[in-house]
């Protein structure tokens, strides 16, 4: 290479280096200004000292995340700041008055967090905002009309009985049983039959096991990514081991939901089937989506349809499985309340061969115990919002637009200022006529964006608890105490292990 050519190449390299340095300095300045803005915005909300780079991440290690969280609840009234890392912070909220103010507004889901779910569940009802969310919610609400929910009780009972029959065989060999796995298969079986018109059994289908495992992987990977500044960039994440694992798990989940959609489409294309569906007064969840796609194609794309199915396939089974598993654990840990529930159910159902819609409102003490377990172990431990405009709370403190609020349902339910002796299992808190703040108990979130399927979930929990208590006596396995982990859904790191005894 000639001397002039070398000089030219050297000059280009210097220019590129200077541009790279300039971009690096601009990014550093941007991050510095972002941190200064956050420090000023959060000055009314104290917190433990945080590191300028990794924030409070060392405080919230996976094994002990709940303990520092509950210490904050006791030390800092109503809310406090939490730094994920140097340039990302949020305000943890665990006061019912604060919750009420936030949920009365139509604030969007925090995009910096919820966008990480898009490769998995797409932009369905959970992630949509604004007018699009309102239209989709209005379209899907009829799928949870009580006329639709009534016959679901029989389907729920059949799925529960399949699970209990399996348990009976297993405990004949070993009374110790991990329940989260089989409960998840049972709730998946239920949602597929009720909301997706599925004719098979997810509890005997091998593909369902791979779907359940994929969901567990996706939840864990989401939690890991939300806590890592390095993994926020999409390109870096896709190239990382976690990103590749996330892609594989999402593909398995999508294959499962695609099969469900295609199977129902094929059923609707049979002669006369579409006309029969149109004549129904109330349609189930998937039929609403498919008819909207077939008859009003522009209003719902194939991508939209799959996103809703992915969302409800996950939410419709996993949160309910968490709730049922923790309820059974709570009753196993408190045999006196378990026996009182059993006696109530025996008086109502007798031999337990059938349970109907009308029975569900006739088990008040069991319902009290279910609600108290949901207080202690809320299936969705928190939701996040991003302020679209400034907000002022009842105590006079305020926050500007752009701040992320983490509405910590778990912390709210364990707040001693809201619930005296919060770690005690006390079903009388939910006795008829007992008074409490309207936003003190939020297992299904609150406001206009509360869980659309909350009645479905409560019905399924009642059916599962009632039929289980009629057939088994439950006790905790003292050698395997659950380790509670608050991810997308509250779960135990080491499963939930019980000892079961078949009742005569």
From Swiss-Prot:
InterPro entries: Cyt_P450, Cyt_P450_CS, Cyt_P450_E_grp-I, Cyt_P450_sf, Cytochrome_P450_Monoox. It is a multi-pass membrane protein. It is found in: Endoplasmic reticulum membrane. The chain crosses the membrane at residues 6-26, 110-130. One of its GO terms (molecular function) is long-chain fatty acid omega-hydroxylase activity. It catalyses: an omega-methyl-long-chain fatty acid + reduced [NADPH--hemoprotein reductase] + O2 = an omega-hydroxy-long-chain fatty acid + oxidized [NADPH--hemoprotein reductase] + H2O + H(+). Catalyzes the omega- and (omega-1)-hydroxylation of various fatty acids such as laurate and palmitate. Has no activity toward taurochenodeoxycholic acid. This is Cytochrome P450 4A25. Heme binds at residue 451. It comes from Sus scrofa. Its cofactor is heme. PANTHER family: CYTOCHROME P450 4A11-RELATED, CYTOCHROME P450 FAMILY 4.
């Amino acid at each position: 290479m000639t001397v002039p050519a070398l000089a030219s190449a050297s000059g280009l390299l210097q220019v590129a280096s200077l541009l790279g340095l300039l971009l690096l300095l601009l990014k550093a300045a941007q991050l510095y200004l972002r941190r200064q803005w956050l420090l000023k915005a959060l000055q009314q909300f104290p917190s433990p000292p945080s590191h300028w780079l990794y924030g409070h991440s060392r405080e919230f290690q996976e094994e002990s995340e709940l303990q520092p969280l509950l210490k904050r609840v006791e030390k800092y009234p109503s809310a406090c700041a939490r730094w994920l890392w140097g340039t990302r912070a949020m305000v943890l909220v665990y006061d019912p008055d604060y919750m009420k103010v936030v949920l009365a507004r139509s604030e969007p889901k925090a995009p910096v967090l919820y966008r990480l779910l898009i490769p998995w569940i797409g932009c369905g009802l959970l992630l949509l905002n604004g007018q699009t969310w309102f239209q989709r919610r209005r379209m899907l609400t009829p799928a949870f009309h009580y006329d639709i929910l009534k016959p679901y009780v029989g389907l729920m009972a059949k799925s529960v009985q399949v699970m209990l029959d399996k348990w009976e065989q297993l405990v004949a060999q070993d009374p110790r049983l991990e329940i989260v796995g089989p409960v998840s298969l049972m709730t998946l079986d239920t949602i597929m039959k009720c909301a997706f018109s599925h004719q098979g059994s997810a509890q005997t289908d091998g593909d369902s096991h791979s779907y359940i495992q994929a969901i567990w992987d996706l939840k864990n990977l989401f939690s890991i990514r939300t806590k890592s500044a390095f993994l926020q960039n999409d390109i870096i994440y896709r190239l990382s081991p976690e990103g590749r694992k996330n892609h594989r798990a999402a593909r398995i989940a999508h294959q499962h939901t695609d099969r469900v959609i295609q199977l129902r489409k094929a059923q609707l294309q049979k002669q006369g089937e579409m006309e029969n569906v149109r004549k129904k007064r109330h349609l189930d969840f998937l039929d609403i989506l498919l008819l909207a796609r077939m008859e009003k194609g522009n209003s719902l794309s194939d991508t939209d349809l799959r996103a809703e199915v992915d969302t409800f396939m996950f939410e419709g089974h996993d949160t309910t499985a968490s709730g049922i598993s923790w309820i059974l654990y709570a009753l196993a840990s408190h045999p006196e309340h378990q026996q009182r529930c059993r006696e109530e159910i025996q008086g109502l159902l007798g031999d337990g061969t059938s349970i109907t819609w009308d029975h569900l409102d006739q088990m008040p003490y069991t319902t009290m115990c279910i609600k108290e377990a949901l207080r202690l172990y809320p299936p969705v431990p928190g939701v996040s919002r991003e302020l679209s405009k400034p907000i002022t709370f009842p105590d006079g403190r305020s926050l500007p637009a752009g701040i992320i609020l983490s509405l910590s349902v778990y912390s709210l339910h364990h707040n001693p200022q809201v619930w005296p002796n919060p770690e005690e299992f006390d079903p009388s808190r939910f006795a008829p006529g007992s008074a409490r703040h309207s936003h003190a108990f939020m297992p299904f979130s609150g406001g206009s964006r509360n869980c659309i399927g909350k009645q479905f979930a409560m019905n399924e929990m009642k059916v599962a608890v009632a039929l289980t208590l009629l057939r088994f006596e439950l006790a905790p396995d003292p050698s395997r105490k659950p380790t509670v982990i608050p991810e997308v859904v509250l779960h135990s790191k080491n499963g939930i292990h019980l000892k079961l005894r078949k009742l005569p």
